[in-house]
Amino acid sequence: MCALEDGRYRSSSDTPIPPGAVRKILRTADGVPLDAMYEPCTAGFAQDSTVDHGGFRGTAIVVAHGFTGSLERPAIRRAARVFARRAAVVTFSFRGHGGSGGRSTVGDREVLDVVAAVEWARSLGHTRVVTVGFSMGGSVVLRHAALHGGPHGGRTEAKPDAVVSVSAPARWYYRGTAPMRRLHWVVTRPAGRFVGRVGFRTRIHDRDWDPVPLSPTEAVPLIAPTPLLLVHGDRDPYFPLDHPHMLASAGPAELWVERGMGHAENAADEALLGRIAGWLVPE
């Protein structure tokens, strides 16, 4: 569910900003400042370039990282680079992560972070905004789409036009693997939260969920008719394959089980990222 296996977080305040990119602090509905970056499409696709056509732009892909990640981590920068060949890209650091304010609620209030990123993309003129989430981010984009997509959804400007969830859990409080037991220690114990803050630059809230948010499996049937793609590796050390199969059986969704793939953005190579981009933005 996170990048704990990658070791200590390294700050990248000198992360180069690509040509035409914009770095901005967004503000969520509950007042949390988010570090975010907008990158224009680098390819010459007329339908998705950042050149205005009648005052409008094409697709923007909003990328939601995993727990302990940030917009500056190499795996997210790689994803943004690949996605930008098809569309504009918005990356951001979830609350409590990287250069953003607040404290992580490990997937609960983070829905508001995705809302802020999607609304920013739409404010820049993008008529089609899609979301891609990894691990914790994968569960968040599912809940975001359930709350803001479909015929029953919330504000129109927060609505996603398609959703990709990579390496997401199907249910909360899962402790069936050693990595998830370690993660629960980080989240629930004072010593663990200290390790998260010092070792991974992740500030974690010390309160339990109240109420418990909609689970990813409960969210899936509420997403239709918004297109949904689920991606999961058959060597994921965090969540075994019963998780994606449970999600896929909950409602209309396409499922890709990737042979030899591990967990989340760190295991997503350029070939897979390119296929995801192609699913989101067909030629």
Residue spans of the language-model regions?
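Glycine-rich "HGGG/HGxG" loop immediately N-terminal to the catalytic nucleophile
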Residues: 73, 95-108
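Short beta-strand element of the alpha/beta-hydrolase
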Residues: 57-66
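The serine-hydrolase catalytic nucleophile loop
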Residues: 67-80, 242
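Conserved alpha/beta-hydrolase
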Residues: 80-101
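Primarily recognizes the serine-hydrolase "nucleophile elbow" in alpha/beta-hydrolase
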Residues: 120-182
